[in-house]
Amino acid sequence: MTDNGTITVEELKQLLEQWNLVIGFIFLAWIMLLQFAYSNRNRFLYIIKLVFLWLLWPVTLACFVLAAVYRINWVTGGIAIAMACIVGLMWLSYFVASFRLFARTRSMWSFNPETNILLNVPLRGTILTRPLLESELVIGAVIIRGHLRMAGHSLGRCDIKDLPKEITVATSRTLSYYKLGASQRVGNDSGFAAYNRYRIGNYKLNTDHSGSNDNIALLVQ
């Protein structure tokens, strides 16, 4: 290290040589999270990804706050304060949207930092909720050897005749209704169906399924 506190090129090379293996593992972890951590592929990696995303918000905010406190000069201090305010507002908006979505669906998936769109499927007397990256006009349902998959998510065993007549897609602002349209049985335990969006409004899910499966949403007053 030189007298002014900077490191030389040789010291930087030695540092990289010593930490090369660790850096490789870090990049490998990034690749695995970015390529395989999806809710409909690998649930374990997806949960790790969500935890990592949750931790990034307070860590990023803390970095900008510390940069403002221990500023190099007033210019960098002002930039750090501005960025801290922006990150704080973004973090606050995430919590507001998440709690609004939770009030609508009563699902912990509402706090997913990756998306605020949730698919809700009433099946076997309960509501199965899964995250979606975008809201579609048509949602397909595929049953392969008695196992239902919808929007890429595995929802367990189901027969084509037991498919719900309605499903919903919730956001922090709206709840969209999808009605069962065309369906076709293939063989004994396989088939496919399509759900078409026909209504959208400010509703919340009705978690009481003692009655009909069709009554899955209530108007928010």
Curated annotation (Swiss-Prot):
Membrane topology summary: Multi-pass membrane protein
Compartments reported by the entry: Virion membrane; Host Golgi apparatus membrane
Residues of the signal peptide: none
GO terms for MF: structural constituent of virion
Virion surface side, ranges: 1-18, 71-78
Keywords annotated in UniProt: Glycoprotein, Host Golgi apparatus, Host membrane, Host-virus interaction, Membrane, Transmembrane, Transmembrane helix, Viral envelope protein, Viral immunoevasion, Viral matrix protein, Virion
Metal-binding keyword on record: no
Keyword flag RNA-binding: no
Intravirion domain ranges by topology: 40-49, 100-221
CDD domains associated with the record: SARS-like-CoV_M (cd21569)
GO CC field: host cell Golgi membrane; membrane; viral envelope; virion membrane
Function, in words: Component of the viral envelope that plays a central role in virus morphogenesis and assembly via its interactions with other viral proteins.
Name listed for the protein in its UniProt record: Membrane protein
Organism (species): Bat coronavirus 279/2005
